[in-house]
């Protein structure tokens, strides 16, 4: 039982690491590309073509993507990178490091993070673009008239107004990240063992529910892990939503206080005959 609890905590840690490691570069890259593609000052040749190409990985099945990267970067001697590495006289490189104690988590996790980022940044980019295009163009025109540079327009106009879309992306990505299963489960050369660095909570649930020996099936552990995963998702979702709402409320209160202060100042000047 203690082993099961340890495995669940390790799986939860792996899930968080894999999600954070692919969400941060994904959102940054998506924001950068969305700003570029929606900037009227930039004339990028073949803009529509690049949008389609960047979105394409999102429609490829996870099985196909995992098979592709196993052929490119894996422990298999037939993989492209290991083949080149061994042709230079080196021993086969352990990209997967399937056991925790081997200490090579960085490679396997890094590859899965890259795959997840590559698969999903196109979808996130489209959502960021839709959010930017939904902003009133007159705000950008006013900022340009006031002499704001590109960085100031981004930080003072685009990002604040894009925050609802970023929060929505964060919540949906967090839900998907906590349910991450396909790529971590499929990316391993040894078909008889799961990479311990990549065992997520969803894989933990599957392993305890689906075993070769039906006598050792642990439906209770699978059910409990599923409920815990659901509760964690709900709590984190509510936390992010409340944080965003509280930030909006704090901003509105600050604006109201400023208006009240200005009103009182004007009233005081009026009483003193200071209004011209």
Say what each PLM segment does.
Residues 1-270, 275-276:
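A structural signal for multi-pass alpha-helical bundles of membrane permease subunits
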């Amino acid at each position: 039982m203690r082993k099961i609890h340890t495995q669940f905590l390790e799986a939860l840690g792996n899930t968080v690491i894999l999600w954070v490691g692919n969400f941060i570069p994904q959102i940054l890259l998506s924001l950068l590309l969305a700003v570029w593609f929606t900037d009227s000052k930039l004339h990028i040749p073949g803009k529509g073509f690049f949008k389609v190409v960047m979105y394409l990985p999102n429609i490829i099945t996870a099985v196909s993507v995992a098979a592709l990267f196993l052929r490119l970067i894996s422990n298999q001697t037939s993989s492209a990178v290991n083949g080149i590495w061994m042709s230079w006289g080196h021993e086969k490189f352990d990209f997967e490091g399937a056991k925790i104690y081997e200490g090579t988590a960085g490679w396997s996790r890094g590859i899965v993070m890259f795959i997840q980022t590559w698969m999903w940044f196109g979808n996130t980019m489209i959502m960021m673009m839709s959010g930017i295009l939904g902003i009133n163009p007159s705000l950008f025109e006013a900022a340009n008239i006031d002499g704001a540079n590109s960085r100031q327009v981004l930080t003072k106009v685009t990002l604040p107004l894009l925050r609802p879309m970023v929060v929505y992306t964060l919540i949906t990505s967090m839900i998907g990240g906590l349910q991450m299963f396909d790529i971590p489960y499929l990316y391993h050369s040894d078909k008889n063992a799961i990479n311990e660095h990549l065992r997520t909570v969803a894989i933990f649930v599957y392993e305890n529910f689906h075993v070769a020996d039906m006598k050792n099936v642990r439906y209770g552990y699978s059910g409990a892990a599923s409920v815990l995963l659901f509760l964690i998702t709900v709590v984190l979702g509510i936390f992010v939503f409340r944080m965003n709402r509280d930030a909006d409320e704090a901003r509105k209160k600050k604006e109201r206080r400023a208006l009240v202060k200005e009103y009182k100042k004007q009233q005081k000047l009026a009483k003193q005959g200071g209004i011209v």
